[in-house]
A protein has these predicted regions:
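Walker A (P-loop) phosphate-binding loop of ABC-type ATPase nucleotide-binding domains
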Residues: 38-42
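Catalytic Walker B motif of ABC-type/P-loop ATPase nucleotide-binding domains
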Residues: 160-164
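Conserved ABC transporter NBD signature motif
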Residues: 59-70, 76-77
Length: 299
């Protein structure tokens, strides 16, 4: 169990002060937990605090009974933590197995036999056994992400934190990566931080939305979808003029009879032929951001 209480983080420079997190309160249990929000919402700051890399300005984090406020607590948490940041620096001239072995040494796995077994185990888990001796510099972006997950798993963590893991991946690698995370979540807590709504929809049963450093939604993906009930429509137009009148265009589909728009907004009076449709997670997210006064530019 992770308990985050009244957590705030302020960055101060000579020219300005930035409140990255503002009184965040969350409880996170076992399984996949999704943290969704736009770029700049404070997600990475929160992940770095949980990983013990950044100290909060205020508040407390307790993970499995250990507080990040104390040196002993931070040490205990790091021993059971795996972390994949947005940008993981890798030694490109090393092979995958050499890099994971190096990371295992840094994580305190001193027993050579145990380390060899763990390296083989995690490379197999992420589907890289056949490429274990290849140099990382020859890997695709998706393969490098899987190396990143492997190094995060090498100490068999109870808590795995992954920050924007699918950004920049092609559709096939994104699906592969999501499936990998779901398979790993049976035995541990995984926090998936992302701005990609589909990643949450396909992996998580519990989630929160962060915006401007504050939690603006906490619940299930189904609960977020319900937020948009009565505010999502489908409208087909033979005109190239894009629907407006305070509506957000979530998607456009070109059909023989015209362009089919999926719209989110408070009123559809200007388009009497529009039909109400069942919200998806992206619709719920767009409606939530609109209702909180946040700018949403989907298309």
């Amino acid at each position: 169990m992770i308990t985050i209480s009244s957590l705030s983080k302020i960055y101060r420079t000579k020219n300005r002060t930035v409140q990255a997190l503002d009184n965040v309160n969350l409880e996170i249990g076992t399984g996949m937990f999704g943290l969704l929000g736009p770029n700049g919402a404070g997600k990475t700051t929160l992940m770095r605090i949980l990983a013990g890399i950044v100290n909060p300005s205020q508040g407390e984090v307790i993970i499995n009974g250990h507080s990040l406020k104390t040196g002993a607590g931070k040490k205990a948490i790091k021993a059971t933590l795996g972390y994949l940041p947005q940008e993981l620096g890798m030694y490109q001239e090393l092979s995958a197995s050499q890099f994971i072995d190096y990371m295992a040494i840094l994580k305190g796995i001193d027993d050579t036999q145990k380390r060899v077994q763990q390296v083989e185990k995690v490379l197999n888990m992420v589907g890289l056994s056949q490429d274990a001796e290849r140099k990382i510099k020859g890997f695709s972006g998706g393969m490098k992400r899987r190396v990143g997950i492997a190094q995060a798993l090498v100490n068999d963590p109870e808590l795995l934190i992954v920050d924007e893991p699918t950004a920049g991946l092609d559709p096939e690698e994104r699906i592969r990566f999501r499936n990998l995370l779901v398979n790993l979540s049976d035995e541990r807590t995984i926090i998936l931080s992302t701005h990609i709504v589909e990643d949450i929809a396909q992996t998580c049963q519990d989630m929160a939305v962060l915006s401007s450093g504050q939690v603006i939604f906490r619940g299930s993906p189904a609960g977020l979808m319900r937020e948009a009930d009565g505010h999502v429509w489908s409208f087909t137009s033979d005109s190239m003029e894009r629907p407006d009148h305070g509506l957000t265009v979530v998607s456009m589909l070109h059909l023989p009879e015209g362009i089919q728009y999926r719209l989110v907004g408070s009123s559809i009076e200007k388009y009497p032929t529009a039909e109400a449709v069942k919200p998806g997670l992206e619709d719920g997210y767009v409606w939530l951001m609109r209702s909180k006064g946040q700018t949403v530019d989907v298309l």
